[in-house]
């Protein structure tokens, strides 16, 4: 578990970078705080006829550089603190990538596994109607997150469109391709992780074809990261895990086969061609690249001394606590931070939004080439700041992002 609340952890990362910059204290205070927090309590009629009331959130952290952008998650443990932290991170993630967005995030406190498909649709449509007062294709553009997918985005898009009386494709991203979605969106976060893993190997002088990689978390991000790292970089993926545990094989896995197995059996732990390990053991394996792509706070003060990887490429949001960051930095382990490493998803969401506004759609190669170019550009921008300030990559990414948002805030001024 994280030693601090997620929001405290996010603010601490911000403060660490802000203290190294010539940032006025009042401007820092503006950048720390969320612009708008909406809490909604809304009724949903269940299949048996009774009505349940659910709690939902939408937080817009900052809109100095453009509309708020960020996902909506469905989870029984969703809290306002968590949603505020994730919106905060989205502000810096979009700025690191130099996208014309600010940060937003949303969530509903619900266990979607306990809902029928009809109940899930009714909940989704009612929640989106409730937050419609603050969203729009030029205000705030939601996207999928934990337990939400292209189907949910289609319901959101239809709900908003019905309410305004015409089809508005650009209200959400992560939609089905047939409904204004972008090709390459599903693989985008994993592809971004792959690009960053390859660039981290370049920095450390590791030959990708001889590199070993462990991936914690085998959902969308972990699966695509593992697949693309093995297929396009030629590295050996020697360990993967999901919520039930992990498997290890020093000879490497056939990741395509592993993904098929996970789809059929719901887990990787029973896969016969690997030795069973725990999630904790996976993190401490002697590999070149570790990709934490599961939950927040996986690498913490309690295990950071035992991490043996040469680089950590963060597929998840907030997988490394500030205390662990200090330990890894002291030990010379390169950490490619979440606000850079997993920004592939929001970058292709940007491409989708642009395509929707223009009603002009790109082919898959255009999407992939544009994403790889932007990820490499952002990685190099962060490395320049890292060298200039002699700091770790996370602090450098924050300095770069804060500088961009602070500049926009100062140039816009305070209205009235």
From Swiss-Prot:
GO terms for biological process: glutamate catabolic process. InterPro entries: Aminoacid_DH-like_N_sf (IPR046346), GLPV_dehydrogenases (IPR053388), Glu/Leu/Phe/Val/Trp_DH (IPR006095), Glu/Leu/Phe/Val/Trp_DH_C (IPR006096), Glu/Leu/Phe/Val/Trp_DH_dimer (IPR006097), Glu/Leu/Phe/Val_DH_AS (IPR033524), Glu_DH (IPR014362), NAD(P)-bd_dom_sf (IPR036291). It comes from the Bacteria. It catalyses: L-glutamate + NAD(+) + H2O = 2-oxoglutarate + NH4(+) + NADH + H(+); L-glutamate + NADP(+) + H2O = 2-oxoglutarate + NH4(+) + NADPH + H(+). The active site is at 105. Belongs to the Glu/Leu/Phe/Val dehydrogenases family. Homohexamer. This is Glutamate dehydrogenase. It comes from Thermotoga maritima (strain ATCC 43589 / DSM 3109 / JCM 10099 / NBRC 100826 / MSB8). The lineage of its organism: Bacteria, Thermotogati, Thermotogota, Thermotogae, Thermotogales.
